[in-house]
Amino acid sequence: MSETFIYPQANLIAGVDEVGRGPLVGAVVTAAVILDPNRPIVGLADSKKLSEKRRLSLYDEITEKALSWSLGRAEPEEIDQLNILHAAMLAMQRAVSGLHIVPDYVLIDGNRCPKLQMPSLAVVKGDSRVAEISAASILAKVTRDREMTELDLLFPEYGFAQHKGYPTAFHLEKLAALGATVHHRRSFGPVKRVLGLV
């Protein structure tokens, strides 16, 4: 972990992260994780810096060893209604409230915290500085990637399994040629343009 993080004085600390702010399609997915100090997990890092194979292996280890973990999400309709930032905050709240053990402190990746029932702190680059946030980033990323692979089976022509819904040249080309699916975020510029909403 880079730039040593000084932990707050707390017994049960949850880490929270989100995946999927940038894609044009699908939910924004969040995870909250309380790690077990007696069952350390080696190799936790920002999910974006790990190979897919390593992420999958760590996913299994985290879900098995964590004291508690939970996923949250906000669907495309909620993203369009609220905007992506507020939808991500809502999904984080859902992840924290889904924990079966109530944390006494929550550390969140980024520079902004959602409203929670307990003290919280936003940690810039938290996914590479805080083990709990790294674990949350891995759970959220693996979950969302799996959803994109499933969506790819329904809409193979869009290539969701490859680009995970991000606005790559290929995705934009297919969006222009084929139009938007019901899973596309209508409030996002490229989708708006295709639907003639701009």
Swiss-Prot record:
It catalyses: Endonucleolytic cleavage to 5'-phosphomonoester. InterPro entries: RNase_HII, RNase_HII/HIII, RNase_HII/HIII_dom, RNaseH-like_sf, RNaseH_sf. It holds the Pfam family RNase_HII. Its EC number is 3.1.26.4. Endonuclease that specifically degrades the RNA of RNA-DNA hybrids. Manganese or magnesium. Binds 1 divalent metal ion per monomer in the absence of substrate. May bind a second metal ion after substrate binding. This is Ribonuclease HII. Keywords: Cytoplasm, Endonuclease, Hydrolase, Manganese, Metal-binding, Nuclease. PANTHER family: RIBONUCLEASE H2 SUBUNIT A (PTHR10954), RIBONUCLEASE HII (PTHR10954:SF18). Residues 11-198 form the RNase H type-2 domain. CDD domains: RNase_HII_bacteria_HII_like. The keyword Cytoplasm applies. Its cofactor is Mn(2+); Mg(2+). One of its GO terms (molecular function) is RNA-DNA hybrid ribonuclease activity. A divalent metal cation binds at D17, E18, D109. GO terms for biological process: DNA replication, removal of RNA primer; mismatch repair. Gene3D superfamilies: Ribonuclease H-like superfamily/Ribonuclease H (3.30.420.10). It comes from Yersinia pseudotuberculosis serotype O:3 (strain YPIII). GO terms for cellular component: cytoplasm; ribonuclease H2 complex. It is found in: Cytoplasm. Belongs to the RNase HII family.
